[in-house]
From Swiss-Prot:
Subcellular location: Nucleus
Transmembrane segments: none
PANTHER family: FANCONI ANEMIA GROUP D2 PROTEIN (PTHR32086:SF0)
Domain of life: Eukaryota
Protein name: Fanconi anemia group D2 protein homolog
A molecular function (GO) term: DNA polymerase binding
An annotated GO cellular component: condensed chromosome
Subunit and interaction comment: Homodimer; cannot be ubiquitinated and does not bind DNA. Part of a FANCI-FANCD2 heterodimeric complex that binds and scans dsDNA for DNA damage. Interacts directly with FANCE and FANCI. Interacts with USP1 and MEN1. The ubiquitinated form specifically interacts with BRCA1 and BLM. Both the nonubiquitinated and the monoubiquitinated forms interact with BRCA2; this interaction is mediated by phosphorylated FANCG and the complex also includes XCCR3. The ubiquitinated form specifically interacts with MTMR15/FAN1 (via UBZ-type zinc finger), leading to recruit MTMR15/FAN1 to sites of DNA damage.
Keyword set includes Chloroplast: no
Glycyl lysine isopeptide (Lys-Gly) (interchain with G-Cter in ubiquitin) crosslink, residue number(s): K561
Keywords recorded for this protein, A-Z: Cell cycle, DNA damage, DNA repair, Isopeptide bond, Nucleus, Phosphoprotein, Ubl conjugation
Gene for this chain: Fancd2
Length: 1451
């Protein structure tokens, strides 16, 4: 064995440093001999030279490489043998090394020995490799020479530590240390380690880095621990070596505890390190993570990473642009690129760790998931989620789930996302496809907040990424637009609109993608079509003058083609596109003052284009009432949304005014000409009209002219006449009044005569003559009523915001007319079941609408058994006729405008009074604007009646009555339900018509949800006034001191109207306060405003009052309404309203008991109209109310026991049609609802119980056992009720929730019984005995289901029996665990029905299988219990057997 060489002979580090400095000061000439000739061979006769030559290596002088004549391994073997066989061995080794030292005193010779040898050509072919080692490397491979050679090398290194690199770029210290790398064997690794560490401690900084990073390649595994310890000390002393030391730690085999200590040390310095050091530091931290420490390390790393390191590139980018503008940018270019490279390298390290270590990605997700506050989230969190989503395929679902939760909890907001993209755009740009894929996934959500987040991902990707990524973003958005998902299409179009505003020039580069959407217009809603044409028109007309206008040409071509189409749907698309494009062209834009002449010429040119386009639309639609109506409505929407150039607006207003006046307005003195079936009168005038200057809407003559035409002629070809159809009356007037309002800042004095002018009509009130009318006359009168009704709706829309008392009074009068006409409509529709009203509001959503006749009436008729078959046949015929009528738009350009019945014959046979719901005809009514509800502010209004000389002749007080209030509240409630309540519509096939819930709300959907909420908040004060008035009304009505005569004066209709107003007000309040948008930070101000209004009704609120206090006061205010609830539905909506407030509270538990108390009061109250429990709607409401009660009560089991123990026995003992006296809502019809909810809540409650552990205190065990005893007792009571109420719904609930209860018992209760059996033996046995009786009933129910062969029940039997068998085995396992194996026995259980009678058909054929009743064996449980009480630890359980002789068990 080779003796251990002494280590480098330095007295201390200072001595080494001094020697090195002295050597550095000496010139190289003094250190070297004169070199020999460049081509000469070293002929020194020393042992060193002779042995090398004899072994096959020739030393060369000068710059020539040493020549190796034999294979490297052969050379080492020959030299080793020569040394070992030398006569003076081992002294020859010292002579050899001394010769080497002498030879290498010359720098050129030393360098030759350190560089690779030259191999002779004849030897090269035989070698397996072309790599040739240096002489020193070859000598280090010989064990007997290695220690001396290493010592010599370390003595040589100090001579060159402070020398600069030679002209050929070779660093002698690096070259010397490189000889020690990758040695096959290290003779004395400890000595080598010591010398390396001493060298590192005195070397210059630049060499220290290289020496440290070389350690893993030099040292053996056995020295890794020692090296790590010394490097850790060096790390503390010299922070500048942090990067190389940590880089080495990643390559050494070190103890995890040691690495943890180093990680903690480095983590403390993380916030102060340089940016260029971060990649290596983060790499070390991530590589040192273990499964157990991953979450802790990642959470700390997330906290310590300083965001300033990442904001540097964006700041440089901003400053760079400023410098470029001054011509000073070049000086900072290198620094910018360096910082960018550091950022990219850092995240490459993170992405690499995430890609290959699932633990790290999961830990990062968990670390972000644990953050609860929005303020604690950083841009790095969002960036990491996006990076993990794009890098790790295994955690995509986890990232999606976490993002959804964070968005819904409002933790990740738009500002944070903006900061993320602006800060990390360099890194996120590389994962742009993954970001778009994530956005696509979020687009499929049903939550609008999640869809909005997906939209923002696309928006910011377009804003911060390069041109290629922008193209990808636009392509992805176009794909979403063509997907067919309504919410997805809307979101994508909104993003495209925002991108045009953000960067129109970049969007124009992608116009070719967007134009492709035009091929999918047929399947889109009107609002979506408007957005598409708005996008394309903005791109087309926002270009600089002189640029290519190919987009404009394409737009004109598409619109002209669609306008000229004979397919009505395409014509409507053309109208929407033309009007939208005209609005973009004619939009009023502020021009620079220095280009007045040029802008004037451009404006004149655009005005000509706009007028010609509008004239084209008018000419293409004037023969079609439907198309004309849509044209006017579209133009009205345009006027309302955009500010047109004054010149264009003036031309439009004048044209519309003249057309309307010529078409619809006649003098009062004009006598209608024509052969009308009814007398014509000027009806519904609000003032006495003078025969000289009064005006009338000429409705009947115009409509009768069209009504008299043959339907086939109207639908087969367009009318050649240019007379305006009365179907366009309302839409034409809407356009007219918006033009006038836009011109005169909302003043409508020019057209105020239209508010109170009468209409030429017959007497619309049918009276007794309704039955004697022909079907044709009924259709005529019904259509006239529809047109009049819609005319007044538009009149109210127009003048609702006028401020003068006179105008307000007239608007209220028109509102009363609307209520009256609504009642008349119901009378006509009740006797014309197949009637199709005239369309007065036309868009693509209403093309396929079929007005549904009263299905409830049909069901009632079938229930009574009267004319059931005929009724069904008539309904089918009606649907067929309506389908035919409404699908003609695919082949013809117009349809029958009159809306008369397709069955032109008198109705034969009399039916009972039919109830008609006007909600089915919503598509045929003109939409009320949101501004109409400002009428709710109206109190008592004095209307002045003037004489012919404009003097006051009389005054009349007008106020908003209950009927008018109900009319407004119904419409407002529908609007809020449509816009504020999320719709969970499922994805539909793209090429199928989508049933839209938005029919009749087209104007509403052109306003933002925030705008609508703001409007409703402004209405809260008047609505509270109305709510309190109704509250007082019902309180007075219920007062005991109210006389019988006073109560009799309140008619049933008045009571119903006031009750309906009460319910609608509560619905409106609930829709507003339950709006999910209040969770968004930007909407908190709206929520506070709403709560301030409610809270101020109790006492004066203060500025800056805490939100929790406002919620509490609002809750108290609304809770006071409980004493005046007039109906069951009102009570339920009040509960839902209070729950909506409770959800926004930080401490909801304080109010939960009040909710439970109110719910119980509603359940224990006898409501009027007792037959309502047969109504499905009432049943749904009762189900919701009972759920609210049981969910909010503090003791669910006690509440269930009260209902089953008090209410149900009262019901059982009561007459058939009676109810429980304690719970009047509990009847035989509603028992199933009570039973289902109680079983579900019982199962939910026990499922949420924790099983507990053996280490819990005895008190905890006793409490849990007591709770389970109550649960099993409730379960027992409920299960036994199926003996009394054995209908299918009850049995189905027993099977379904009985199995779930048994499964919950197995999971939650049996572990508790395992470690409670010994201490609470009696309680456990009592619990099992009670449960055994219940499972026996479940077994009987399984047999009952089989014998009756009811597949609806039998499908639950296998799962239930499986659970019962598992229970038997689990009980046996518990007994074995407690050393009571002998207490368990199995027997057979006979199949019996619900009443306990044996099922003979399933009786086992073998008499041996029938013991003396397993029932008796099961009941012997009691005697065995007594034996156990006497000291025997026994328990028993039973097992059942069905007809197939398979063992079924119950316990």
């Amino acid at each position: 064995m080779v003796s251990k060489r002494s280590r480098l002979d330095f007295e201390d580090k200072e001595t080494l440093a001094e020697d090195a400095s002295k050597i550095m000061k000496q010139p190289l000439s003094k250190l070297a001999k004169k070199s020999c000739g460049s081509h000469e061979v070293e002929e020194n006769g020393s042992v060193f030279v002779r042995l090398l030559k004899a072994s096959g290596l020739t030393l060369k002088t000068g710059d020539n490489q040493n020549q190796l004549g034999v294979d490297q391994i052969i050379f080492q073997r020959k030299l080793f043998q020569a040394l070992r066989k030398h006569p003076s061995y081992p002294k020859v080794i010292e002579e050899f090394v001394n010769g080497l030292e002498s030879y290498t005193e010359d720098i050129d010779s030393l360098r030759n020995c350190l560089l690779s040898c030259e191999r002779l050509q004849d030897e090269e072919a035989s070698m397996g490799t072309f790599y040739s080692k240096s002489l020193i490397k070859l000598l280090l491979g010989i064990d007997i020479l290695q220690p001396a050679i290493i010592k010599m090398l370390f003595e040589k290194v100090p001579q060159f530590l402070f020398e600069s690199e030679s002209r050929d770029g070779i660093s002698m210290p690096r070259l010397i240390i490189s000889q020690l790398k990758w040695l096959d064997r290290i003779v004395d690794s400890k000595d080598l380690t010591t010398q390396m560490m001493q060298l590192i401690s005195v070397a210059p900084v630049n060499l220290q880095h290289d020496f440290i990073t070389s350690l893993p390649e030099i040292l053996g595994d056995s020295q890794h621990a020692n090296v790590g310890k010394e490097l850790s000390e060096l790390l503390v002393q010299n922070t500048s070596l942090t990067v190389p030391i940590l880089d080495v730690f990643s390559s050494l085999r070190l103890d995890p505890n040691f690495l943890s200590e180093i990680r903690q040390l480095v983590m403390g310095k993380l916030s102060s390190v340089r940016l260029e050091d971060l990649p290596v530091i983060v790499k070390f931290i991530l590589h040192s993570v273990t499964d157990s420490t991953s979450l802790e390390v990642i959470a700390e790393l997330r906290e310590k990473l300083n965001v300033q390191h990442f904001t540097l590139p964006s700041r440089i980018q901003a400053s760079q642009s400023k410098l470029k503008s001054k011509g000073l940018a070049s000086s900072s270019g290198n620094q910018e690129n360096s910082d960018k490279d550091c950022i990219v390298l850092l995240f490459d390290v993170i992405k690499s760790a995430i890609r290959y270590e699932k633990t790290i990605s999961e830990a990062w997700i968990k670390a972000i998931e644990r953050i609860q506050s929005a303020a604690e989230h950083k841009a790095l969190d969002v960036a990491m989620l996006l990076i993990i989503y794009g890098t790790s395929t295994q955690t995509k679902k986890g990232v999606e789930r976490l993002l959804r939760n964070k968005i819904q909890s409002d933790c990740i907001q738009e500002q944070l996302l903006d900061s993320t993209f602006s800060t990390h755009c360099l890194v996120l740009k590389d994962i742009c496809p993954s970001i778009l894929l994530l956005a696509q996934t979020l687009f499929h959500s049903q939550d609008q907040r999640i869809i909005l987040f997906g939209s923002l991902l696309c928006k910011y990707a377009f804003k911060f990424f390069d041109t290629y990524c922008q193209q990808e973003v636009v392509g992805a958005l176009v794909t979403h637009v063509c997907s067919g998902n309504e919410a997805e299409v809307d979101a994508a179009l909104d993003v495209l609109l925002e991108l045009i505003v953000l960067n129109a020039s970049a969007m124009r580069l992608n116009a070719a993608f967007i134009k492709g959407i035009l091929d999918y217009l047929e399947n889109m809603s009107p609002q979506q079509i408007r957005k598409i044409f708005c996008i394309l028109s903005t791109l087309a007309f926002s270009q600089q003058p002189g640029t290519s206008n190919h987009i404009q040409d394409d737009m004109h071509l598409v619109i002209r083609k669609q306008l000229s189409s004979t397919v009505f749907k395409y014509k409507l698309i053309g109208i929407i596109g033309a009007v939208t494009m005209a609005g973009i062209m004619a939009e009023d834009r502020t021009m620079p003052s220095n280009s007045t002449q040029r802008s004037a010429s451009v404006s004149s040119e655009q005005h000509t284009q706009v007028t010609s386009l509008l004239q084209l639309v008018h000419s293409c639609t004037e023969h079609s009432p439907w198309a004309s109506s849509l044209y006017y409505d579209e133009f009205a929407n345009l006027i309302q949304e955009r500010k047109l150039a004054p010149k264009t607006l003036e031309w439009v207003a004048q044209t519309i005014f003249n057309d309307f006046q010529d078409a619809f307005v006649v003098d009062f003195c004009a006598v209608p000409e024509g052969d009308f079936p009814f007398p014509v009168k000027a009806l519904y005038g609000l003032e006495e009209c003078n025969t000289q200057d009064g005006i009338v809407i000429n409705l009947l003559p115009l409509f009768f002219q069209e009504f008299a035409k043959d339907v086939s002629q109207v639908t087969s070809q367009e009318s050649s006449q240019k007379s305006m159809s009365p179907l366009c009356l309302a839409s034409h007037f809407r356009l007219l009044r918006l033009c006038v309002a836009r011109q005169h800042n909302g003043n409508l004095d020019e057209i105020d005569a239209l508010l109170d002018c009468p209409l030429f009509l017959p007497d619309l009130e049918p009276g007794e003559k309704l039955e004697s009318m022909s079907a044709k006359d009924r259709s005529l009168m019904c259509s006239l009523t529809f047109l009049t009704f819609n005319w007044f709706r538009e009149v109210v829309n127009a003048f609702c915001q006028q401020t003068s008392p006179e105008m307000k009074g007239k608007v209220l009068s028109r509102l009363k007319d609307l209520v009256e006409l609504q009642e008349i409509l119901e009378k006509y529709l009740a006797v014309i079941p197949d009637y199709v009203p005239p369309f007065t509001s036309v868009d693509l959503d209403t093309l396929d609408v079929i007005p549904r006749s009263n299905s409830a009436v049909a069901a009632k008729s079938r229930h009574k058994g009267k004319t059931g078959g005929k009724k069904q046949k008539a309904d089918s015929s009606t649907a067929s006729c309506t389908d035919t009528l409404l699908t003609e738009d695919t082949s013809e350009c117009d349809v029958a405008p009159s809306g008369k019945s397709q069955v032109d014959k008198e109705s034969t046979g009399k039916e009972g009074k039919t109830f008609v719901s006007l909600q089915n005809y919503r598509a045929f009514f003109r939409e009320l604007d949101i501004e109409v509800f400002s009428i709710l502010h109206s109190g008592l209004v004095t209307k002045f009646i003037l004489d012919t000389e404009m003097h006051t002749e009389a005054t009349e007080v007008v106020q908003l009555g209950p009927a008018e209030l109900l009319f407004l509240l119904e419409d407002l409630s529908q609007k809020l339900e449509n816009r504020l309540t999320p719709s969970f519509t499922k994805r539909v096939c793209f090429f199928k018509n989508k049933g839209s819930r938005n029919i009749g709300f087209s104007h509403l959907h052109q306003r933002s949800v925030q705008d609508i909420v703001h409007c409703v908040v402004q209405l809260l004060t008047p609505m509270c006034n109305h709510l309190e008035n109704i509250h007082n009304f019902f309180q007075c009505l219920g007062a005991e001191n109210l006389s019988v005569n006073d109560k009799a004066r309140v008619t049933a209709q008045e009571h119903y109207t006031m009750s309906s107003c009460y319910q609608k007000l509560l619905q409106v309040f609930h829709a507003l306060l339950a709006w999910k948008g209040f969770t968004h930070q930007s909407n908190h101000r709206l929520l506070r405003s709403a709560l301030e209004v409610l809270a101020s009704r109790l006492k004066q609120t203060e500025e800056g009052q805490p939100l929790e206090e406002l919620l509490s006061q609002s809750f108290s205010y609304l809770q006071n309404l409980q004493h005046s609830i007039p109906s069951f539905q009102c009570g339920l909506y009040l509960l839902r309203l209070l729950m909506a407030l409770l959800e926004k509270s930080a401490v909801p538990t304080q109010k939960k008991e009040k909710l439970a108390s109110l719910a119980k009061q509603l359940l224990c109250r006898a409501w009027p109209h007792g037959d309502k429990e047969k109504n499905p709607t009432f049943n749904d409401h009762l189900h919701d109310l009972l759920c609210i009660y049981l969910e909010h009560t503090d003791n669910v089991l006690k509440a269930i026991e009260e209902i089953t123990g008090v209410g149900v026995p009262e019901l059982v003992n009561a007459p058939k049609d009676a109810s429980s006296s304690t719970f009047p809502t509990l009847t035989r019809h509603t028992f199933v609802i009570f039973f289902r909810v109680m079983m579900a809540e019982l199962e939910k409650t026990v499922k949420g119980l924790q099983a507990g552990t053996a280490t819990d205190s005895q008190q905890v065990h006793e409490e849990k056992l007591l709770y389970w005893n109550m649960a099993v007792r409730d379960f027992s009571i409920l299960i036994n009720l199926m003996k009394v109420f054995d209908s299918y719904p009850v049995l189905h609930v027993c099977l379904k929730y009985g199995r779930r209860f048994v499964e919950a018992f197995l999971k939650q209760c049996m572990p508790l019984l395992d470690f409670s059996f010994r201490k609470h033996r009696d309680d456990v046995l009592s619990l099992l005995q009670t449960l055994q009786l219940n499972t026996r009933l479940l077994h009987h129910l399984c047999g009952h289901s089989k014998i009756h062969q009811d597949t609806r029940l039998t499908k639950h039997v296998p799962l239930l029996k499986k659970s019962l068998e598992l229970l038997v085995c689990r009980v046996k396992a518990m007994l074995v665990l407690n050393n009571c194996r002998e207490a368990f026995w199995l027997g057979t259980l006979k199949n019996r029905d619900l009443q306990g009678e044996e099922i003979i058909s399933q009786h086992p054929s073998s008499p041996e299988n029938t013991s003396e009743d397993s029932e008796d064996g099961m009941t012997s449980y009691v005697s065995r219990n007594r034996a156990i009480e006497d000291g025997e630890d026994e328990a028993n359980d039973g097992q059942d057997r069905d007809s197939d002789e398979s063992d079924d068990s119950s316990s």
